[in-house]
Structures are given as structure tokens and as C-alpha cells.
Amino acid sequence: MFDIGWSELLVIGVVALIAIGPKELPGVLRMVGQWMGKARRMASEFQGQFQEAMREAEMADLKKSFDEVKEAASGFSPSGMMSSLQRDVDKALDIEGVDKPVESQPAASAAPETSATVEAPATPTTPEPPRVETFVEADAHQAVGEPLAIVREIKPEPQPQSLDGAAPAEAERLKDAKAS
């Protein structure tokens, strides 16, 4: 613990024998032993309390994770699945009611109205004119289907045909050059 070797302990014993004297040395050693015992007991008590606190913290963590698993498992029960499906169906039915046209007010309340009421203009049904962003997006989508390499197509130039028949002879000469 203190990294004291046998030779160092012997030196301390000799110095204590000379400084304290042979008469009082056993009482001093007994007192030092008692202090060491008290220090060890306090250290072990502290260590025990610390380990107990760690066990309690681990138990609290285990209980918390167990409760989370229990809550998750209750959501997977058949009745829990059916209730969530029922909620989804109810939401879908509520959305269907949005598409229905608004019913007109009763005839009694419609009679006092005059032509002074201005109806809201109808929204146009024509699509919006194309924007620059639309063309950029279209070009980006077209680029996906194009090949990765840039390929240049070469079209052969038409050869002028002379009246004297020199063009067929030149074509045969090119064929011979390609063959070799």
C-alpha cells in the first residue's frame, strides 16, 4: 500500500527503538496498530456504502428498462393493434368528409340576403405557367438516363463524285488500306 520494502521497514524500526526507547515501544506499536485498524474499518465501510449505492442505481436502471419493455409489449397486444387500426380508420373517415361540398344555408336565412353580397371569385383551373426551376429539374431528371461518358457521333461527310469515276477507285484504295 505504501510501497515500503523490508529494508526500509527495518530502518524505521531501529529509528523508533532509538527515539522512543524499549520501554514505551510496545505501547506505541499497539496504538499505531489500533489507528491502522480504525482506518481500514472506515475504508471498508465507505467502500460497502459506495457499492450499495451502485447496486441501487443499477436496480433503478433495470427497473426503468423493464418498465419501457413492458410498455412496448403492451402496444403489441392484439387489442392494442386493433385499437390503433380503429383510430387510423376513424381518421380516414374524417378525411373523406372534407371532400363533400358545403351545404347551402337554410332557405329562411337565405331570403333576407340581397345581391349586395359578393361571392368569392373562383380559382382558375389552368395550370401555372412553367418556371425556370421546372426546366432545371426536368434537365436533371433527363441527365439520369444519359450515359456517363460523353460520346460524339461522327457522321461521314458525303464525298463529291466526279464524272470521271475517280471516286470508286479511291473508295477501293481506302478499303485496301483498312484491311492491311
Swiss-Prot record:
Assembly description: The Tat system comprises two distinct complexes: a TatABC complex, containing multiple copies of TatA, TatB and TatC subunits, and a separate TatA complex, containing only TatA subunits. Substrates initially bind to the TatABC complex, which probably triggers association of the separate TatA complex to form the active translocon.
Molecular function (Gene Ontology), one example: protein transmembrane transporter activity
Keywords, comma-separated and alphabetical: Cell inner membrane, Cell membrane, Membrane, Protein transport, Translocation, Transmembrane, Transmembrane helix, Transport
Family, similarity comment: Belongs to the TatB family.
Function: Part of the twin-arginine translocation (Tat) system that transports large folded proteins containing a characteristic twin-arginine motif in their signal peptide across membranes. Together with TatC, TatB is part of a receptor directly interacting with Tat signal peptides. TatB may form an oligomeric binding site that transiently accommodates folded Tat precursor proteins before their translocation.
Cleavable signal peptide: none
Compartments, record wording: Cell inner membrane
Membrane topology: Single-pass membrane protein
GO annotation, cellular component aspect: TAT protein transport complex
Lineage: Bacteria, Pseudomonadati, Pseudomonadota, Alphaproteobacteria, Hyphomicrobiales
Gene name as annotated: tatB
Biased composition (Basic and acidic residues): 170-180
Species annotation: Bradyrhizobium sp. (strain BTAi1 / ATCC BAA-1182)
Stretches for region Disordered: 95-180
Transmembrane feature ranges: 1-21
Skewed-composition ranges (Low complexity): 103-123
Pfam families given in the database record: TatA_B_E
Major localization listed first in the record, in broad terms: membrane
PANTHER family per record: SEC-INDEPENDENT PROTEIN TRANSLOCASE PROTEIN TATA, CHLOROPLASTIC
The protein's name: Sec-independent protein translocase protein TatB
Gene Ontology biological-process entries: protein transport by the Tat complex
